[in-house]
Amino acid sequence: MNAQQVLSQFQATGVQTCFHGRHINPQIYAGLDGTNWRLKDYEAREGYAALRKMLGIGGGEAMTPDQVVATVKESALRGRGGAGFPTGLKWSFMPKQYTGPKYVVCNSDEGEPGTCKDRDLLQFNPHMVIEGMIIAAYAMGTQVGYNYIHGEIFQTYQRFEEALEEARAAGYLGDNILGSGFGFQLHACHGWGAYICGEETALLESVEGKKGQPRFKPPFPASFGLYGKPTTVNNTETFAAVPWIIRNGGKAYVECGKPNNGGTKIYSMSGDVELPGNYEVPMGTPFGTLLELAGGVRKGRRLKAVIPGGSSSPVLPADLMMACTMDYDSIAKAGSMLGSGAVIVMDDTRCMVESLKRLSYFYMHESCGQCTPCREGTGWLWRVVDRIHNGHGKPSDLDLLDNVADNIQGRTICALGDAAAMPVRAMLKHFRHEFEAMIAEAQRKTLTPTLSQGERVSTEARSA
C-alpha cells in the first residue's frame, strides 16, 4: 500500500488515533485497535512466540545468549531513544564473567518535546515491550529489570502494571519462566516529570531514590549502573522491536529497512501538518512520503523548516529536509539528528525567533543545575532570544548567542547542554536573516525620534 492509498483509507474512515492504516509495513503497531492490548490479544498476534522460540519451547533448540546477541547485531537495530547506538553491540558490553546482580532497564521517560511514541506503545502494546525486555535479560544474563515511565502519564503506568500482572500470572515472568529454568523479575517505576531523567544515568539515580542528576562517565552503566552493578538501558521502542527480530531473524529485519538502519521506526509527526500522530514506516523512507502520510503541510501552505528528531535536534530548512530519507545516516549528513523520531513541521507562517525562544525556555527550565555552563548558559540563551523577540535586540546579540552556545556545547556532564546549544546554532545558521531583520526593526524604532506632545500640536497647527 502506497502513501496515497493509506491516506485515502484514513480519510474514508475518519479515524483520529494512531490505530490507522497510514503505517507502511508496520511491525510494532500492526493489528492494534486501541482495545486489544491484553495478553490474550497479544498472544493472538504471535505474542511471546519469540520468547518460546528462544527458550526452545514447542520444538527446536533453545538459543544461547550469545546467539540472541548475534541475531540482534545482525538486525542492525539501533537505539530508538535518540543516540542510535547499535543495540546488539550495546548488549555485548554486559560483562559475562560478572556473577553478581545485573540489571536491564527500559527508558520510558519520554520527555522530549514532540515525542509521543513510547506512551502509545506502553498504553496499547505493553506486552511487546515486556517480551523484548525478557529476551534482553536472557541475552545478557540479568535477573531483574525496571521500566522507568514518565511521571506525567500515570494512566500509562497503571496500564503497564496491569500487563505485568498478566505476564506473571501466565508464567512469562518469575523465577522459572515457562519451566525453562530461566528467571526474570520485571518492575514498573514512575518518575516525576523531570526531563533530565531521560538521561540514562540520571534515570538510574532516580530509580535508586536519589535526585535525578547525571553521573560522570566513565564508568558507564555497563560496568557501574543501577546500585553500582552492571546495567543496560534501552529505549521503549528498542525493546519493542526485539520480539520481531527473534521470530523472523536479523537478516529479515535489515531487509525491512536499509543497511546500517534496520527495520521500521515510529515517527511522531507534529506541528503544521494536517494529520499529526505516530507513523511507523521502514527506515530509509523518503521524508516526502512521511509528510504525505501526515496529510501534507496544513492548509496547503509552503514547507519552511523541519526539526527532524525532537526539540534537541538542529532544524533543517525545507530544501535540505525534502532531500533526506528518514534514517540516522541521511539526517546526519544533512546536519541534524534523527533523535527520537519526533518530526516537528513548520510552515511559512512560523517565526523562527519565536520558535527558538520557546525551545530555549524549555531547556532553561529543565536544566538540573549541576553543571555551570548549562545552568547559567541556558538562562543566557533564553534571555537574549527573548530580548530579540520582544524588540529590544542589538546587533551584537547574535555573536553573543554564538559565544554562549560555544561555552555550553561539549562542556557539560550530559547532553542537555548540547541539546540547548545546537538548536540555537542551527537557527542562526539557516535563518539568521530573520534574527537580523527583527534586530534591525528594533534599531530603527530606537533611532526614530519621537515628537513630544507640544511638538505634535505645533506641527498639526502649521499643517492646518
Kindly give the residue locations of the regions a language model identified:
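Ferredoxin-type iron-sulfur electron-transfer modules in oxidoreductases and energy-metabolism complexes
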Residues: 1, 49-74, 100-104, 108, ...
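Cofactor-/ligand-binding subdomain signature composed of acidic, glycine-rich
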Residues: 2-69
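Gly-rich Lys/Arg/Thr-decorated short loops/hinges at beta-loop-alpha junctions or inter-strand turns
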Residues: 34, 42-49, 106-118, 221-227, ...
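Conserved phosphate/anionic-ligand binding catalytic regions in large, soluble enzymes, centered on
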Residues: 47, 72-94, 136, 191-205, ...
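Accessory "access/gating" subregions that flank catalytic or transport cores
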Residues: 54-97, 255, 260, 268, ...
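Histidine-anchored nucleotide/phosphate-binding helix
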Residues: 125-139
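Short amphipathic, charge-patterned alpha-helical segments
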Residues: 132-136, 282-300
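Hydrophobic alpha-helical positions that pack around
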Residues: 157-283, 295
